[in-house]
Amino acid sequence: MTFFQAVILGFIEGLTEFLPVSSTAHLILATKWLGIAETDFVKSFVVVIQFGAILAVIWLYRKRLWQEPALWRRALTAFLPTAIIGFLLYKLIKGFLFESELVILLALTLGGLILIVFERWHRAGEQNTISAKQALIIGGAQALAVIPGVSRAAATIVGGLALGLSRRAIVEFSFILAIPTMLAATSYDLWQSGASFAPDDWFLLLVGLITAFISALIGIKFFLRLIERRSFIAFGLY
């Protein structure tokens, strides 16, 4: 992987992580289209650079995270289903699903159709607070995103809207939920493969992290403005 390729992948990660379009699928397909070899480092790279996007969420929501401890409890509750499934299926995900373009394309297509159908016929809710039970259900929806091609953001958004939450409430909760989810995925992957990283690999990771942080700041602000004026149908079509 070159410096330029690391910048491109970091930009894609940050910009797409919080949009309902599956950042993982974009990264996997981008590595193939850029001709990047499917090494263990590259597989870890597309996971680890998510930490840059995590930092962007923490930075933008730092005051709210400090002032609303209940929000943390709801996010941790929602994180549990993904943690359990991700841990149990880690080897399957890394060894097979990440390499299957068919799985990715099918998941992208199905996810897009669900988003379009749901947005077209579902009536928007008004609820702005999330109960522990609702958080757990949203977490169950997010667990589907362990499959490459299934958008974590789309899964949580559809789950939240189905429970009657307002668009902004579930979108912002999806951002917050990303913190424990992506932090755990990043940390576990580093623990599994960090010892095999060469010095140059660590430099490329840093490049990807910084680029992902900057582009995530842009992506989050863009998405929040967009949902005030537009539906999610455009993302489903995309």
Task: Place the predicted regions along the sequence by residue.
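Multi-pass membrane proteins that catalyze or facilitate reactions on polyprenyl-/lipid-phosphate substrates
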Residues: 1-238
